[in-house]
């Protein structure tokens, strides 16, 4: 979590850890708009690990994003009580690495899970870094899952948008066969992934999409993966859309269309006055408020209003 330092002595570290990655991510999105796209057609069905947003561009952007992610450190995750390593083998036989935070009671004793929560990460995050953020769901009696995208952390495969979307569709389908209540949580790039999964017709009970781009077709990707094109009246009321007025990674022009279409179709929405990009909020208090909004929607289906 990025928190603004209390003293000037920590400002350099804060800039390196929080500000610099933010600038680099934003620059990479601009690069997507500037690079030439490889020819593609929306009707073409590419191979799983084919590039769909430009052969050079997609490879370079994912390479850049992956370099911003920390090195994998399983001990960081497995040092937490209730966390175990898990893996998922995709349809093209790539093994994705992740973690499960097992459902437990207030004393930490394992309990029969009520359902599951699956988180799809932002582009510079890895699973062992973020599994702790799902502890509240395990404590509420749900198994919480998080995976490294293919080509990230300890996961096999090439870093490709098309493959990542298909991976998560398969993961959700597998989890749906094992649990009663089904909850999805996507941040930034992960929000785009989850909207595509939802658009494929999978069952889910509640979802939160935090700061996802409305479209990727403006950057040379096929319109079939635009999150806004997967939003329908049937699914919108089950999805909470969160954006932030202080987001310097994906601004209003990137996120507004998806949020406003969601609201028009009956989705609860939040455009937080003090929210930045997910996990880049300036204070712990702001981040905690955001986390509680996510938790309330996923666990209780509490309807929230624009602020």
Where are these regions (language model features)?
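An N-terminal hydrophobic leader/cap segment in hydrolases
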Residues: 39-89, 97
């Amino acid at each position: 979590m990025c928190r603004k330092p209390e003293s000037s002595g920590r400002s350099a570290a804060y800039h390196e850890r929080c500000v610099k990655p933010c600038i680099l991510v934003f620059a990479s999105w601009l690069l997507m708009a500037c690079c030439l796209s490889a020819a593609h057609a929306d009707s073409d069905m590419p191979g799983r690990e084919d590039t769909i947003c430009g052969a050079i561009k997609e490879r370079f952007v994912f390479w850049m994003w992956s370099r911003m992610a920390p090195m994998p450190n399983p001990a960081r995750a497995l040092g937490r009580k209730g966390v175990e390593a898990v893996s998922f083998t995709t349809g093209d036989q790539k093994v994705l690495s992740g973690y499960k935070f097992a459902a437990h009671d207030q004393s930490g004793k394992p309990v029969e899970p009520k359902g599951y929560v699956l988180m799809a990460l932002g582009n510079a995050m890895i699973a062992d870094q973020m599994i702790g953020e799902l502890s509240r769901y395990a404590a509420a009696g749900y198994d919480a899952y998080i995976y490294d995208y293919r080509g990230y952390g300890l996961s096999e495969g090439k870093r490709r948008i098309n493959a990542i979307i298909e991976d998560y569709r398969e993961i959700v389908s597998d989890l749906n066969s094992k649990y009663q209540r089904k909850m999805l949580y996507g941040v930034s790039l992960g929000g785009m992934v989850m909207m595509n999964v939802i658009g494929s017709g999978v069952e889910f009970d509640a979802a939160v999409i935090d700061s996802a781009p409305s479209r990727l077709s403006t950057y040379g990707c096929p319109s079939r993966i635009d999150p806004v094109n997967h939003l329908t009246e049937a699914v919108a009321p089950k999805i909470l859309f969160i954006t932030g007025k202080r987001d310097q990674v994906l601004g209003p022009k990137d996120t507004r269309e998806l949020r406003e279409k969601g609201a028009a179709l009956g989705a609860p929405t939040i455009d937080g006055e003090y929210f930045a990009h997910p996990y880049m909020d300036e204070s712990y208090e702001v981040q905690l408020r955001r986390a509680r909004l996510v938790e309330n929607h996923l666990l209780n289906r509490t309807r929230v209003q624009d602020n």
